Amino acid sequence: MKKVLFATTALIATASVAAADVRISGYGRFGLDYNDANDRAVNGVSKTTITSRLRLQFDMSAETDSGVAFDARFRAQAESRDNTPGGAAFNGARFGVSYQGFRVNVGNIIGAVENMPGTYLETRTAGIGIDGASFYSHVGNVNNEFFNWDAYSSAGTGVNGVEFIYSTGGFTGHVSYSTRNGAVASDRIGVMGAYTFGDWTIAAAHQSSDAMWEDKTLVSVAGDLGQFGVRVAYADNDGISKWGIYGNMDIGSASNLLVFYTDESAVDAADVLAGRGDNRDNVAGSNANEGGSYGIHYSYDLGGGASLEAGYRRASNDNDTFQAGVYFSF
């Protein structure tokens, strides 16, 4: 099974069917999710529930006589979690223009931080299990301030931003910008650089935001060593640091086993007084995300774009989840 070292929520490749300048691709996944945070007597949700997602992706493109390419993408997605059924909805569109190694996107952009290699797991869901298990494995997710960076939204409208991407040889550079309407406009600026040499990729990204607690800097080093994959990552999330170590190995020709461990530092007490959430251990009202999280994931390739996926994750707040199911792409 080929290890994917650049899997992000925006860029996971799938097979597609081409018709003129329109391509349709997608995937489905469904399975069981055990989550010990649920309790029918407390929140009305069973500990074991069905989790599922069906996604259709539409890519349209046209190219001028001079070689300038124009493209657009949108998705339709139906998702159910915690046994709550969900209907299908279209997301916001992304438009792009590219020429040789340059690309400009507008609308529902990818985002520089989101596009950084070495931050998501090398699994089909980019996380643990069949739906990611809340992505505690990502060093940018701390203190219940998860996904507070610009990223392509598969189920929503996105941020309506603009981004510039340049790739040449083993180098990729990415700058993104977005602004949010409101009584006070809120801007985000992201920058990312990645370089691949041989079997190794190094990457770094930074986001500067007008919103409180959203500034962050991330770095990663990843190696694809044949049968084995190794990676380390670190992030400073506006004063809360988090590091992670990751490894995966192919077992035979059809199986892959992955493990990870991350550790999150405590929030500064002055930030809590200023209104930030509290992740510290042994503090009343804390989300208790300080400390270590770990997980293990197993994948078995069934052929034809289908695989069995199973994983266990223990979060730093002592939440346990186990998931198993089927993932198939088309």
Regions found by a protein language model. Give the residues of each.
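Outer-membrane beta-barrel proteins
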Residues: 2-330
